[in-house]
Amino acid sequence: MQCAQYTASRCRSCQWLDKPYPQQLADKQNHLENLLSDHRVTQWLSPLFGQESAFRNKAKMVVSGSVERPLLGMLHRDGTPVDLCECPLYPTSFAPVFAVLKTFIARAGLTPYNVARKRGELKFLLLTESTYSGELMLRFVLRSQTKLSQLQAALPWLQQQLPQLAVISVNIQPVHMAILEGEQEMPLTEQQALPEIFNQVPLFIRPQSFFQTNPQVAASLYATARQWVRELKIDSMWDLFCGVGGFGLHCADTETRLTGIEISAEAIACARQSADQLGLKNVTFAALDSTQFATAETQVPQLVLVNPPRRGIGAQLCEYLSQMAPQFILYSSCNAETMAKDISLLADYRIERVQLFDMFPHTAHYEVLSLLIKC
């Protein structure tokens, strides 16, 4: 993959861009195998990967420059703005959208936020595309509601220029910190969820719900989890840290008793919408803390699926899972180091199967799926 900003040393987000892609995969696989070297793994599966470029479905753009000539991208360490509208990680459909958004910022008078001066209103633009429909979700992250009426007044022009904009919202992030979004979200369109489909499973993306940024590899990850779980012939499972329900909805059939737990109410609303559309009747989704939910339950499912954030599931949940002793644990991780630590705490389980999914080409990061079986 070629990138002008990387070549000019203006952006180094893709730390491994100079490394041939086959070597990237080999290095990630070696890293994973070294982390699990103290454990016996019955079956290592080959890494799964997708496109090397144009694979992201989401752009997080810092807005800088002036209201007349806004710049979308990132800020260099010295505060210099870097335009990322031509970033090769984004699909080609994004560049013309960014061009229209720059014009819209000027028309609406949305003054870009100046970090050094702590002045201005528009901090970020967050753009997400559905690979299923081609529709877009756009979020304006503002410092306050000062420019909200101006934005709303100019919005019909933007919608005319970009009819694929299905979901538009404003997020208020008032603090002068490197935080992407605040708690307050205000919808500007009647439609509030972006539809997506992976492997014939309908999924929905709301403004404040997490969704994987590499749809091609994410679909493969979900399909693999479904295959592994279906082979186990289970009839009850928990999906902890379930997000919008991608894993559980793939793994469950009409007879499976599925309980999905996620702290984000927005994500749970998406999961419930998907379950309704699939006609699943034995499914429950709840907006709760996954660890608190699990440790308060007395019934034991046959399988517990966990997909935690980078910190892992932690000692408390590991201890409880060991006591609860479900027959199977399916662990999906975006941080193999914390996963390895967690697995070490699950001493009564053996690792049946492991597979790496390269969700983040040109970086050291990757996803990994591990199936654990009670000894």
Swiss-Prot record:
Residues reported in the UniProt entry to bind S-adenosyl-L-methionine: 212, 241, 262, 307
Catalytic activity: uridine(747) in 23S rRNA + S-adenosyl-L-methionine = 5-methyluridine(747) in 23S rRNA + S-adenosyl-L-homocysteine + H(+)
Protein task: Catalyzes the formation of 5-methyl-uridine at position 747 (m5U747) in 23S rRNA.
InterPro entries recorded: 23SrRNA_MeTrfase_RlmC, MeTrfase_TrmA_AS, MeTrfase_TrmA_CS, SAM-dependent_MTases_sf, U5_MeTrfase_fam
Family: Belongs to the class I-like SAM-binding methyltransferase superfamily. RNA M5U methyltransferase family. RlmC subfamily.
NCBIfam families for this protein: meth_trns_rumB, rumA
Pfam families on file: tRNA_U5-meth_tr
Domain of life: Bacteria
Protein name as catalogued: 23S rRNA (uracil(747)-C(5))-methyltransferase RlmC
Keyword Amino-acid biosynthesis: no
GO molecular function, one term: rRNA (uridine-C5-)-methyltransferase activity
Keyword Methyltransferase assigned: yes
Example of a GO biological process term: rRNA base methylation
UniProt enzyme class: transferase
Record keywords: 4Fe-4S, Iron, Iron-sulfur, Metal-binding, Methyltransferase, rRNA processing, S-adenosyl-L-methionine, Transferase
Sequence positions that bind [4Fe-4S] cluster: 3, 11, 14, 87
Catalytic residue positions: 334
EC assignment: 2.1.1.189
